[in-house]
Amino acid sequence: MIASYRGRDFLSMNDLTGEEIEEVLDLASELKIRQKKGISTPILKGKTLAMIFSKNSTRTRVSFEVGMVQLGGYPLFITATDSQLSRGEPIADTARVLSRMVDGIMIRTYSHSEVEELAYYADVPVINGLTDYEHPCQIMADLLTIKEHKGQLRGLKVAWVGDGNNVCHSLMIGAAKVGMEVAVATPPGYEPDQKVSLIAQKETSRWGTKLLLTHDPVEAVTGADVVVTDVWASMGQEAESAERVKVFEPYQVNGELVSHAKQDFIFLHCLPAHRGEEVTAEVIDGEHSVVFAEAENRLHAQKAILTLLLG
């Protein structure tokens, strides 16, 4: 199986088929079991991963660093200010140089076009650790978490409430590809990108499931197996924060809203969370919340991705 993935990039959930997503999740589960049992898996012994960060991170940095170490490899942390990128070196040159020294590159940055350019010029696999357009590693962890708690993915309904942002984009594509029903509720003007909606619509049609885009959070959450949200203002949107709080207030995930979901629903949030804004403490700290299991699964999902692309 590894041979079919080796050398590929992972920039978007659309880079994988539904079947491939399931294979990644199966490997992630296997690696998680081995790690819990204390079984060493030095699959990437002698391999180095360059990790470029233009945006601050807790979960992305720790999960990739720990993941590489557990797989026997070496993680190399690089901030934009530490590198020549901050002095105007072209991304193409950075890609060519790093490709001669490392076995893979993970980048967490603002512009999705930067990641695409890096991947175009790099001769080693490039992994999208987050851009303003997608966050595919997060959604691999989310799908792993859903499968662990629900036993399956196909046929479940996932509801997104809030901003049609990068996490929403990756969730729509990933969930649709594995046969889930997808419902997205956003304020007017904050809908997901139309290209993403078209991809998700095509995938749900293939499975015979549904894609719902609405401005009504109750409509989206009704009958949901999984409820997901994110912060109202992402990094780089701080200047819009006050305005966004006003716009998104009706989209808070609270006890009243989730009462419309299935009784055994689970709640996901990529973290960090702002209790009292996009979600209440009642929900995120309640019995239906699996956000910390979700955070842990960043490690296991990314170990699977690293194994397949760099192994």
UniProtKB/Swiss-Prot annotation:
It is found in: Cytoplasm. Pathway: Amino-acid biosynthesis; L-arginine biosynthesis; L-arginine from L-ornithine and carbamoyl phosphate: step 1/3. One of its GO terms (cellular component) is cytoplasm. GO terms for molecular function: amino acid binding; ornithine carbamoyltransferase activity. Its main location: cytoplasm. Keywords: Amino-acid biosynthesis, Arginine biosynthesis, Cytoplasm, Transferase. It is an enzyme of class 2 (transferase). Pfam families: OTCace, OTCace_N. InterPro entries: Asp/Orn_carbamoyltranf_P-bd, Asp/Orn_carbamoylTrfase, Asp/Orn_carbamoylTrfase_sf, Asp_carbamoyltransf_Asp/Orn-bd, Orn/put_carbamltrans, OTCase_ArgI. PROSITE patterns: CARBAMOYLTRANSFERASE. Its EC number is 2.1.3.3. It catalyses: carbamoyl phosphate + L-ornithine = L-citrulline + phosphate + H(+). The keyword Chloroplast does not apply. Carbamoyl phosphate binds at S57, T58, R59, T60, Q84, R108, H135, P136, C137, Q138, C270, L271, R298. L-ornithine binds at N166, D230, S234, M235. GO terms for biological process: arginine biosynthetic process via ornithine; citrulline biosynthetic process; L-arginine biosynthetic process. The keyword Amino-acid biosynthesis applies. Belongs to the aspartate/ornithine carbamoyltransferase superfamily. OTCase family. Reversibly catalyzes the transfer of the carbamoyl group from carbamoyl phosphate (CP) to the N(epsilon) atom of ornithine (ORN) to produce L-citrulline. This is Ornithine carbamoyltransferase. It comes from Carboxydothermus hydrogenoformans (strain ATCC BAA-161 / DSM 6008 / Z-2901).
